[in-house]
């Protein structure tokens, strides 16, 4: 009874625009959707007194995007002037889509995809000027270890940017992928 009722109520709420729904409908790929939304991923930081512009964040810098998905956001950072961009995720299926987009955008020469766990990487100490984790921390099992590892591989004077949707947000827990009812979690 509970599931059927939820299913009926859910029909009253339109699903939010979501990349997986768009990809399933053949509208766009996850990577391209991420790329188009790239500016949205950094707007939180541009309002701070520490960052004056996207060029300030990325220009001439080595950037690691932890929890990059299909790397559309990563490519956006590359287009903002990053010297080298590295995307890291644990989902192997994203790698091909990421390299395809890098080629399409002319970023292949400065892009690397790393399949791995952000809590224990193979990067040398102080490898990156910028580490960004956009909508990633809510997916990691050991956030303290991920942050400690990020600190290890971040260059002295580098910047770590982290944001994630709070669980208690109306569409928290990423249930908006399949359920349009706010606060259902």
What do the PLM-derived regions correspond to, one by one?
Residues 1-124, 130, 147:
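Conserved N-terminal segment of class I S-adenosyl-L-methionine
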Residues 75, 97, 142-143, 171-173:
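Short glycine-/acidic-enriched loop or helix-start segments at secondary-structure transitions
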Residues 80, 148-150, 177-181:
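Glycine-rich, phosphate-binding/catalytic loops in enzymes
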Residues 133-136:
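A short beta-strand submotif of the Rossmann-like class I SAM-dependent methyltransferase core
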Residues 139:
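Histidine-centered divalent metal-coordination motifs
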Residues 144-156:
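A short glycine-rich, Lys/Arg-flanked "PGG" loop and its adjoining helix->strand segment in the class I
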Residues 161-185:
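Conserved class I S-adenosyl-L-methionine
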């Amino acid at each position: 009874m509970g599931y059927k009722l939820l299913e009926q109520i859910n029909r009253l709420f339109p699903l939010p625009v979501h990349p997986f729904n768009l990809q399933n409908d053949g509208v766009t790929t996850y990577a391209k959707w991420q790329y188009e939304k790239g500016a949205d991923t950094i707007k939180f930081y541009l309002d701070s007194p520490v960052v004056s512009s996207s060029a300030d964040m990325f220009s001439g810098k080595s950037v690691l995007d932890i929890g990059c998905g299909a790397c559309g956001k990563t490519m956006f950072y590359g287009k903002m002037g990053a010297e080298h961009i590295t995307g890291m995720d644990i989902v192997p299926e994203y790698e091909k889509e990421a390299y395809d987009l890098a080629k399409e955008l002319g970023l292949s020469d400065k892009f690397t995809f790393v399949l791995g766990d952000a809590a224990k990487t193979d990067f040398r100490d102080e490898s990156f000027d910028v580490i960004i984790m956009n909508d990633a921390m809510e997916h990691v099992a050991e956030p303290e270890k991920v942050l400690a590892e990020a600190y290890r591989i971040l260059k002295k004077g580098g910047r770590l940017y982290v944001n994630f949707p709070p669980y208690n947000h109306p569409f928290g827990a990423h249930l908006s992928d399949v359920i349009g009812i706010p606060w259902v979690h």
